[in-house]
Amino acid sequence: MTSYTFTRELRLLTPAQFKSVFSNPIKASSAEITLLAIPNSEQHPRLGLTVAKRYVKRANQRNRIKRIIRDSFRLNQHDIPHLDIVVLVRNGVMEMENAEINKLIEKLWRKLSRRYNG
C-alpha cells in the first residue's frame, strides 16, 4: 500500500543539505514560487521550505503557505523524481487563495519532473 506520510526522512534538515541544492539546480518557477532541485542518492524526494518574513509578514500566513506546500508534496511524492527540492516563496503569494497556491505548486511539481526527466 502506498504511504502518504511526510516523515523526517522526506525533509531537508541541515544547512548543508539546503546549501547543496543552491549549487547548479534544476529550476521550475512562477512569479510567486520557485522550485530548486538537485538529484539525490536517496530512494525518495526530499523537501525544504523557505518562506521569507520579507515577503510574508505574518507568521500565521507563512505557516499556511508552508502547510499547503507540504501537503501537496506529501500527496505527490510518488510522482516526483528522487530530488532534493527547496521551495522559495516570493512576493505575491500572500494574496493567493489556498486553492490557487495548491494548483500552482502542483503545476510546478510536473514542470520540475519534466525538466529532470527530459
Curated annotation (Swiss-Prot):
Reactions listed under catalytic activity: Endonucleolytic cleavage of RNA, removing 5'-extranucleotides from tRNA precursor
Entry superkingdom: Bacteria
HAMAP family per the UniProt record, alphabetical: RNase_P
Record-linked InterPro entries: Ribosomal_Su5_D2-typ_SF, Ribsml_uS5_D2-typ_fold_subgr, RNase_P, RNase_P_CS
A cellular-component GO term for this protein: ribonuclease P complex
PANTHER family attached to this UniProt entry: RIBONUCLEASE P PROTEIN COMPONENT
Enzyme Commission designation: 3.1.26.5
Signal peptide: none
Subunit structure comment from the entry: Consists of a catalytic RNA component (M1 or rnpB) and a protein subunit.
KW Hydrolase (keyword) present: yes
Key words, A-Z: Endonuclease, Hydrolase, Nuclease, RNA-binding, tRNA processing
Coiled coil, from the record: none
Task performed by this protein: RNaseP catalyzes the removal of the 5'-leader sequence from pre-tRNA to produce the mature 5'-terminus. It can also cleave other RNA substrates such as 4.5S RNA. The protein component plays an auxiliary but essential role in vivo by binding to the 5'-leader sequence and broadening the substrate specificity of the ribozyme.
Any GO MF annotation of the entry: tRNA binding
Family: Belongs to the RnpA family.
Any Pfam family: Ribonuclease_P
Name of this chain's protein: Ribonuclease P protein component
